[in-house]
Amino acid sequence: MNLTAKLANRPDDHGLREGYLLLADISGYTAFLTGTELEHAHEIIGELTTLIRERLEPPMRFVKLEGDAVFCYAETGTFREGERLVELIEACYCDFANRVVDMTRATTCRCGACAAISSLGLKFITHHGSYVV
């Protein structure tokens, strides 16, 4: 029996689905952590990943946070037009960029982590196709 047939026989909540997979990843994360004070670095990354998750969910469904990467999915019907997903990504990116600017301006700390906030960026990887929950 092939994989598609096996998945088709599974309960609906664990079967093969069509939809969007999205990974939002903070760029500059590794250099940021290795070159700065960890206490403030973890607080900064935590605040930024929380912002990303809150901006994407809903309509996306959160799956996992892996370090600096937020992984989400949405079934095909969530976005009637693909442009809506692009708009969600754009809004998330703008919120992230604005938060980085706000954090940079608001800090009075001179530690390496706080001084390097502006070096962080955000990139997205998205795919539409079949997946298993």
Q: Where do the language-model regions lie?
A:
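Acidic, glycine-rich loop-and-strand cores that form catalytic or ligand-binding grooves
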Residues: 91-97
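Catalytic NTP-binding/metal-coordinating core of nucleotidyl cyclase/transferase enzymes
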Residues: 3-88
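Catalytic core of nucleotidyl cyclases, primarily class III adenylyl/guanylyl cyclases
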Residues: 57-84, 99-133
